[in-house]
Design a protein with these regions (language model features):
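N-terminal capping segment at the start of a domain
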Residues: 10-27, 169-171
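A broad detector of the eukaryotic-type serine/threonine protein kinase catalytic domain
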Residues: 19, 23, 140, 172, ...
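Non-catalytic, mobile gating and regulatory segments of ester bond hydrolases
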Residues: 1-6
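Thiamine diphosphate
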Residues: 79, 88-100, 118, 122-124, ...
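Cofactor-binding active-site loop characterized by glycine-rich and histidine/acidic residues
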Residues: 18-21, 33-158
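Short glycine-centered, acidic/aromatic-flanked micro-motifs in structured strand/loop junctions
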Residues: 25-26, 109, 139-140, 168, ...
C-alpha cells in the first residue's frame, strides 16, 4: 500500500520530470500536464494492477497532457529517465500518446473528444467478455466543448454503463485563455447529472480524496 508520504514524493518527482521534458522539447502543454499529476500517479501506482491480463483501462482523452503520462511512467520504471526525446520523430515520447511506442495506455489520443466513446467500448467489452475491468477516462474541461463528448455522455446515462469512470480535469484553462472566456460550459455538475451520472466533486491534488472516491468506485465491481 502506498503511503501518503511516498505518494507525495512520487508526485514531486513526476512534476520535475514534466518540467524537464517540456523544457528540453521547447514546447508542450505544461498546465494540462501538471494539473493531473496526483490522479495519474494514483491510477498507475495504486488503482491498476498492470500484471493482470484483464486489467482496468486508462484513456487519457486529453492527450496533449502526455508529458504527465511519461513523467509517471519514468517513476514507475516503465520508461527510462531521458528528457531529450519528447516530441522527436521516432521517439517513444510523442507529443500525444501513441500505442505503437507506449503500450501502458489504452488509446492513442490526439484529436480531442474521442476518449469517452472508446471508454464506453471497453465498458461494454467487459460485460460481453464476462471480465471484471473498469475504464478510467480523463477529460479536459476545454475538451467538453467537443460535441462527441455529450453524445457519449448521453449513451452512458441511457445504457447505464456503470464501469466507466469519467474524470474531468476542471482546471478552468485551455490553450490561450480561460475555458469560460472561450466557451462557457455552465454548471457541469447539473449537465452530467441530467444525463444520469452520479457526480462527485473532489480536490484532484489531495491523496485522501482521490483514494476515497476511486476505492469506492472500484469496490462496486469487485
Amino acid at each position: 500500500m502506498l503511503s501518503k508520504k511516498n505518494f507525495n514524493k512520487i508526485c514531486l518527482e513526476v512534476r520535475r520530470n514534466i518540467i524537464e521534458l517540456i523544457y528540453n522539447a521547447g514546447s508542450g502543454h505544461l498546465g494540462s500536464s501538471l494539473s493531473i499529476v496526483e490522479l495519474m500517479v494514483y491510477l498507475y501506482f495504486v488503482q491498476i494492477n498492470f500484471n493482470n491480463k484483464h486489467r482496468d483501462k486508462i484513456i487519457l482523452s486529453k492527450g496533449h497532457a502526455a508529458p504527465c503520462l511519461y513523467g509517471v511512467a519514468m517513476e514507475k520504471k516503465i520508461l527510462e529517465k531521458n528528457f531529450k526525446y519528447l516530441r522527436k520523430i521516432g521517439s517513444k515520447l510523442q507529443g500525444h500518446p501513441d500505442r505503437k511506442f507506449f503500450n501502458h495506455i489504452d488509446l492513442g489520443t490526439g484529436a480531442l473528444g474521442q476518449g469517452l466513446s472508446v471508454a464506453i467500448g471497453y465498458g461494454i467489452a467487459s460485460y460481453l467478455q464476462k471480465k471484471k475491468f473498469n475504464a478510467y477516462c480523463i477529460l479536459g474541461d476545454g475538451e467538453l466543448q467537443e460535441g462527441q463528448i455529450w453524445e457519449a455522455a448521453m449513451y452512458i446515462g441511457s445504457k447505464k454503463i456503470l464501469n466507466v469512470c469519467t474524470i474531468i480535469d476542471n482546471n478552468k484553462f485551455q490553450n490561450e485563455m480561460t475555458v469560460k472566456e472561450t466557451l462557457d460550459l455552465g454548471n457541469l455538475q447539473k449537465k452530467f447529472e441530467s444525463f444520469g451520472f452520479k457526480v462527485v466533486k473532489i480536490n484532484g491534488h489531495r491523496f485522501s480524496e482521490i483514494s476515497k472516491i476511486l476505492t469506492k468506485f472500484k469496490k462496486k465491481f469487485y
